[in-house]
Amino acid sequence: MPKHSTKCLLPSLPWRGSLAHRIPRRRRAKMSDTYPPSSDFVSNAHVDAAKYDEMYARSISDPEGFWADEAQRLDWMARPTRIKNTSFEFGRVDIKWFEDGVLNVAYNCVDRHLKTRANQTAIIFEPDNPEDPAQHITYAELYDKVNRMANVLLSQGVMRGDRVVIYLPMIPEAAYAMLACARIGAIHSIVFAGFSPDALANRINDCGAKIVITADTAPRGGRKTALKSNTDAALLHCSDKVRCLVVKHTGDQTSWIQGRDVDLNYLMEHAAPDCPPRPMNAEDPLFILYTSGSTGKPKGVVHAS
């Protein structure tokens, strides 16, 4: 699938003239002030200004050496020897990074932290209701959930290279799903939970998804979006072979189609807690993210591992 670029257009403003004319002079002055970071903040920075300038200069003068060193920060199953392979000739644009390297993104995000950070927080989930307590999910818990979801996907016939559309609110299961796909070599595509059934159907069909992961409803700002109902409407325009994995997030009642819809909570609870990470080439597709469509039909941008 080709890589595309798009530009972001700001929405037209409901007033004419400069925005500054609408802001009181005193507030305008404050908006133009600069705020230097505190000495404590500066002392704890991973990279200070001088080091940044040094790194940037080397990245320009010796890009292969610079990125070869940066690649050492990752855990590789096979370390790359070919770092940068690019061509910008007209009609022959080709960009490859670490093309003979082998790794697994999920392993780098989760597994390698278990030795020293198993009980540290990996994800903080803030529920929509401000009165509900935040959830702190440790690396050990994240590892368990990701492995279980990976095994669920395998049980549903998802294989290396298959596409999985994720149509979820910002809940932990969204992170589990992305990492589970990376673990088994499936390609995920996030669809914003505020998108319409038509937009969802277009993306499912365009990438040829085998699975859609959604939730019953998505609470936001005191309101609920019926994600499962939207998914039902979208799948009317998709192949009848697409399966639907449903996260019971709010517990709201939803329609259910036997043979197509699957209770993801139940399957994860009963799935095996271990799934070995698949070796993936650095240039293997990791995810597909669709452009806004401001220049026509949304285009799938493929991001490599």
Describe the role of every protein-language-model region.
Residues I123-L179, S196-A201, R260-E269, S305:
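Conserved AMP-binding/adenylate-forming core of the ANL superfamily
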Residues V164, C181, P285, T291-S294:
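Conserved S/T- and glycine-rich ATP-binding loop of Class I adenylate-forming
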Residues R183-Y266:
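Structural core segment of the AMP-binding/adenylate-forming
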Residues I60-R82, D100-I124, E283:
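A short N-terminal helical cap/helix-turn-helix that marks the beginning
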Residues N119-T121, L245-V247, I257-Y290, K297, ...:
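Conserved pre-ATP/AMP-binding loop-to-beta segment of ANL
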Residues C109-I137, G251-S255:
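AMP-dependent adenylate-forming
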Residues M31-I95:
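N-terminal amphipathic, basic-rich helices that act as targeting or association modules
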